[in-house]
A protein has these predicted regions:
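Residue-level detector of beta-strand structural context in well-folded domains
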Residues: 70-72, 112-114, 174, 192
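Hydrophobic alpha-helical segments typical of transmembrane helices
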Residues: 38-42, 112, 160-163
C-alpha cells in the first residue's frame, strides 16, 4: 500500500542527576538536540525526504531555559504526514532507547515507539507487529496482526563502529552518506526556527 501517516514518540524521564551538567539546562541542551535529532534520521529513512516542518516547545515542568517537551509536524515530499512528540519529563515506555534493545544501558520495555500507517496495513517499530484486515479493508472488519519475527542484532553499536572502520579503510560504502547527515541537520535547524516563530518552515 501507500504510506499515509506516522506517529513517533520519544517519552522518557531524566532524573535530577542528568542536570548536574549545567549545559543541559541551557539552550541546545534539551531533548530536541539530544534525543529528537536521532529520530529525524530514522524518520527520513522510513518515510523519505521531508518537505516542511512545524514545531512547538514547552518548558512546562522544569522551567529551565531549555525545552523539556516538543511536538513536530512533518510533511513529506510523498504527501505523507507524521507527528513526533519528545519529552524528558514523561515517565513512559515509548522511546527508541527503551524499545530497540540496542544499548544495554537502557532497560527494554518490549513496546514500540514508531507507528507507520498505510492503505493496506500498519506497522509498529521496532517490535515489527503488522496490522491488517483479511479480505475487505474496513474499520467494521476485524483487525489481525502478525509478528514479522526478524531477528535484530543486539550488537548494533558495535556493528556501526565496525562499519565505520570498513568505510575508512575503503572496504565498504557508507550506509548513511554525508548528504543524509546534512539533510538531517537542515531539518533540525528548521524545527528550531519553527519553534521560535510558530511558522511552517520549508526544507530546501
Amino acid at each position: 500500500g501507500k504510506i499515509v501517516a506516522g506517529n513517533v514518540m520519544c517519552w522518557l524521564y531524566k532524573n535530577k542527576d542528568w542536570y548536574k551538567e549545567k549545559w543541559r539546562i541551557k539552550k541546545g541542551g534539551g531533548p530536541l538536540g539530544i534525543n529528537l535529532v536521532h529520530d529525524i534520521d530514522l524518520i527520513c529513512y522510513l518515510l523519505g525526504p521531508v518537505q516542511s516542518v512545524q514545531s512547538a516547545t514547552s518548558n512546562l515542568i522544569r522551567k529551565y531555559e531549555v525545552e523539556d517537551t516538543a511536538v513536530v509536524n512533518f510533511i513529506f515530499k510523498s504527501g505523507a504526514l507524521c507527528t513526533l512528540s519528545v519529552s524528558d519529563t514523561i515517565v513512559g515506555p515509548w522511546s527508541y532507547e527503551l524499545t530497540a534493545g540496542e544499548n544495554p544501558a537502557y532497560p527494554v520495555t518490549n513496546q514500540s515507539a514508531y507507528y507507520i500507517g498505510g492503505t493496506k496495513g500498519s506497522i509498529q517499530f521496532p517490535n515489527l507487529k503488522h496490522w491488517y484486515n483479511k479480505g475487505e479493508r474496513s474499520w467494521w472488519k476485524p483487525m489481525y496482526h502478525k509478528d514479522m519475527n526478524i531477528r535484530l542484532s543486539r550488537f548494533t553499536l558495535i556493528n556501526q563502529i565496525n562499519h565505520l572502520c570498513d568505510v575508512v579503510k575503503g572496504k565498504a560504502k557508507p550506509k548513511v552518506t554525508g548528504e543524509d547527515g546534512l539533510q538531517s541537520l537542515k531539518i533540525f535547524d528548521a524545527i528550531i526556527k519553527s519553534s521560535k516563530s510558530g511558522k511552517k518552515i520549508s526544507i530546501k
